[in-house]
Amino acid sequence: MCWKKIASWFKPDPVTPVAKRALLFGINDYKSIENDLDGCLNDVDDNEKKLTAMGFVCSVFKDSEVTCSTFYNEVKAALLSMRPDDFLYIGYSGHGTTIRSNHEPDGYCEALYLFDGPFTDDRMMELQQMTPAGAIVDAKFDSCFSGGMAKNPVKNRYYQMPGVPKVRKKVKRIAKSESQWVIFAGCSEEQTSADATFNGRANGAFTFYDLKCFGLGVSFADEITKIKTHLPGHGFDQAPELLGKTELFTYKY
């Protein structure tokens, strides 16, 4: 048998990056803290349904699947597979927090509080630097990085780290102007993101109304304008923010 001849025609299938991909992460049931949430898994399910209808290929991670290593590795793999003009949607619903840091003037940095602990803005910035030129990343964080109290009957999506005073932060360090990431923050710096109930079903307030605002042909700028109208109009004291390069805000889904 001529192995050389066989090798000449046997070639592995090329790995073709997905033009529109979504990574969706949600945590209701936390491993080591008592203040679990109610609407994060519904947020993920609802986003998956809508994004799939829009032509996205979705990967979903829930509760114990949303570890720091899984989040990092999944986002990294998706970024490294991207080509110019590819679109990656990253959705996170869960707690945010603040931790002590030597990198910030005030001594604290923001973090997503994942199933096994905080995922800091430093690690997120590592991922940003892997984004290929010309690719677009839309990252939505339905969480908060401030320690304010939410009014009943809603919960707030903030976890107060032991030994850390209440400080007010937002995702400013992971929204650098030179980045190809466009970031939707669920609330402004002095507010909290609500984990609420709509018609007997739990959702994040930001996600619930965001799903009504984005779709094919809608720009990021139009989306944030609509959300800012919906939330206060329905009694929620939170003003989502759009962060990143302003020239990317006109990009349409």
Outline where the language-model segments fall.
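Cysteine endopeptidase catalytic domains of the caspase/legumain-like
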Residues: 2-253
